[in-house]
């Protein structure tokens, strides 16, 4: 009988990536197949997030729902992972003693051993240590599910913004070796992946070691990923403005695989609030970076993160944020009302902005973003957009759906052979969360890929011999 695994995931794309790795790992080591519901599972894992308010209580409410499953099936294994597990540790077992496993983001690779310990008679296993990058050495080959895929290139953050728990739950910045990242991308490309999304809590701070010990910057990594055959689009998240350096901006001029979309969290448009948050930059510095980038990519679309009602935020501070939103012309935001995270420096500040004011400001901000997004979408009508076809439309399974470079969902009539490839679409209509279009051409008509025999490539190269008589390969320009 097939053993079943159910994973419930809360939080960021890194958590989604981690959950997929857990599933792949337990499939390869124990043969567990993913279940659709917790009721049919032999193992239940909750991958948690500590960013939102009352994250801990949300975890215990969910565990309470699963308690009866454990009573009905005593051999059921229940595990809690992610950032809340890293924060709470032993407290989870104290409040929910029926939980078998507690593991942090950096120890998910040890799940097979933990499960074996429970099956061997251990009452519980708790491992919330920070073994840095070890987890990537123990994970199986990636499995592609469609033409897009996430690839984690680093873990943790060393910025210590005053509101953020990430350095305490995922540790400080640790970058994966370059060769490991490139191998994972190449393996995904072999399985038909056309777009990769490079992940990290502070992804553009990547400083990955080469096999010879030299350090690779994020801009250099982008160039190498773009050179992998089959990869036609590159996205990345989440970035920090301080690490969004000129070499990354310049990469947009030379790497066409980098999409015309950037998510760059700013949190506030007020220098005073940015200083309280310990963000390390001003609003004008943020604007300057984006203006440089838009000189290279005039059609760039922008999204960002905002915290509303940070301690001490005045009406003037909020207006500065609204001015920044208008100046940068953001068309998407992830905006949250501030709530203190236990253990962070900001938790010691007086939370002096009323809930009513926070909600009013949040509504104003979201309305501004929505208006800008609708205007930008309407300007796309009659334009031609290249769309990566991801599969059937969620709204109408008889249609197909995909994304433009600027991250807009487009629904259109098409044929199954288009899935996994590119189509050029004329945008005909705009809806609240999507666009509609008509297919103009398929990938076969785009000349995206030109197959050239190795002999033809070599024939174009020039070989130069140095003073020692050693031939040096020099690519032709």
Swiss-Prot record:
Binds 2 [4Fe-4S] clusters. One cluster is coordinated with 3 cysteines and an exchangeable S-adenosyl-L-methionine. Its cofactor is [4Fe-4S] cluster. InterPro entries: Elp3/MiaA/NifB-like_rSAM, Methylthiotransferase, Methylthiotransferase_CS, Methylthiotransferase_N, Methylthiotransferase_N_sf, MiaB_methiolase, rSAM, rSAM_horseshoe. It catalyses: N(6)-dimethylallyladenosine(37) in tRNA + (sulfur carrier)-SH + AH2 + 2 S-adenosyl-L-methionine = 2-methylsulfanyl-N(6)-dimethylallyladenosine(37) in tRNA + (sulfur carrier)-H + 5'-deoxyadenosine + L-methionine + A + S-adenosyl-L-homocysteine + 2 H(+). Residues 378-441 form the TRAM domain. [4Fe-4S] cluster 1 binds at residues 12, 49, 83. One of its GO terms (molecular function) is N6-isopentenyladenosine methylthiotransferase activity. Residues 143-375 form the Radical SAM core domain. [4Fe-4S] cluster 2 binds at residues 157, 161, 164. It is found in: Cytoplasm. GO terms for cellular component: cytosol. It comes from the Bacteria. Its main location: cytoplasm. Residues 3-120 form the MTTase N-terminal domain. Catalyzes the methylthiolation of N6-(dimethylallyl)adenosine (i(6)A), leading to the formation of 2-methylthio-N6-(dimethylallyl)adenosine (ms(2)i(6)A) at position 37 in tRNAs that read codons beginning with uridine. Monomer. This is tRNA-2-methylthio-N(6)-dimethylallyladenosine synthase. The lineage of its organism: Bacteria, Pseudomonadati, Pseudomonadota, Gammaproteobacteria, Alteromonadales.
């Amino acid at each position: 009988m097939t053993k079943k695994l159910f994973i419930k995931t809360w939080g960021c794309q890194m958590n989604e990536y981690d959950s997929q790795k857990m599933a792949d790992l337990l499939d390869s080591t124990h043969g567990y197949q993913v279940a659709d519901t917790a009721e049919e599972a032999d193992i239940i894992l909750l991958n948690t997030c500590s960013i939102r308010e009352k994250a801990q209580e949300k975890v215990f409410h969910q565990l309470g729902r699963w308690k009866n499953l454990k009573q009905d099936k005593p051999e059921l294994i229940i595990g809690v992972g992610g950032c809340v597990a890293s924060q709470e540790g032993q407290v989870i077992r104290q409040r929910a003693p029926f939980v078998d496993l507690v593991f942090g983001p950096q120890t998910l690779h040890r799940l097979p051993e933990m499960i074996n310990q429970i099956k061997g008679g251990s009452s519980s296993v708790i491992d919330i240590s920070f073994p840095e990058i070890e987890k990537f050495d123990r994970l199986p080959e990636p499995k592609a599910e469609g033409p897009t895929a996430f690839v984690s290139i680093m873990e943790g953050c060393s910025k210590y913004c005053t509101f953020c728990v990430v350095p305490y739950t995922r540790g400080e910045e640790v970058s994966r070796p370059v060769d490991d990242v490139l191998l994972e991308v190449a393996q995904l490309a072999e399985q038909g992946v056309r777009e990769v999304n490079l992940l990290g809590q502070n992804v553009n701070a990547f400083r990955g070691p080469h096999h010879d010990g030299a350090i690779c910057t994020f801009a250099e990594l982008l160039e190498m990923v773009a050179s992998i055959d089959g990869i036609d689009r590159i996205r990345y998240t989440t970035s920090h403005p301080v690490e969004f350096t000129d070499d990354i901006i310049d990469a947009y001029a030379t790497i066409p695989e980098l999409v015309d979309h950037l998510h760059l969290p700013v949190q506030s448009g007020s220098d005073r609030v940015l200083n309280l948050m310990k963000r390390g930059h001003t609003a004008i510095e943020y604007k300057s970076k984006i203006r440089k980038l838009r000189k290279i990519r005039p059609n760039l679309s922008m999204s960002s993160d905002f915290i509303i009602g940070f301690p001490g935020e005045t009406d003037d501070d909020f207006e500065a944020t609204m001015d920044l939103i208008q100046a940068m012309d953001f068309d998407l935001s992830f905006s949250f009302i501030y709530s203190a995270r236990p253990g962070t420096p900001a938790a010691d500040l007086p939370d002096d902005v009323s809930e009513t004011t926070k909600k009013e400001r949040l509504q104003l901000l979201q309305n501004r973003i929505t208006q800008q997004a609708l205007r930008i979408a309407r300007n796309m009508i009659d334009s031609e957009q290249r769309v990566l076809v991801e599969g059937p439309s969620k709204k109408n399974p008889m249609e197909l759906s995909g994304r433009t470079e600027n991250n807009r969902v487009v629904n259109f009539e098409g044929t199954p052979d288009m899935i996994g490839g590119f189509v050029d679409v004329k945008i005909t209509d705009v809806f609240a969360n999507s666009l509609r279009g008509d297919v103009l051409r398929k990938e076969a008509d785009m000349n995206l890929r030109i197959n050239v025999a190795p002999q033809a490539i070599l024939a174009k190269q020039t070989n130069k011999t140095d003073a020692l008589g050693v031939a040096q390969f020099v690519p032709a320009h």
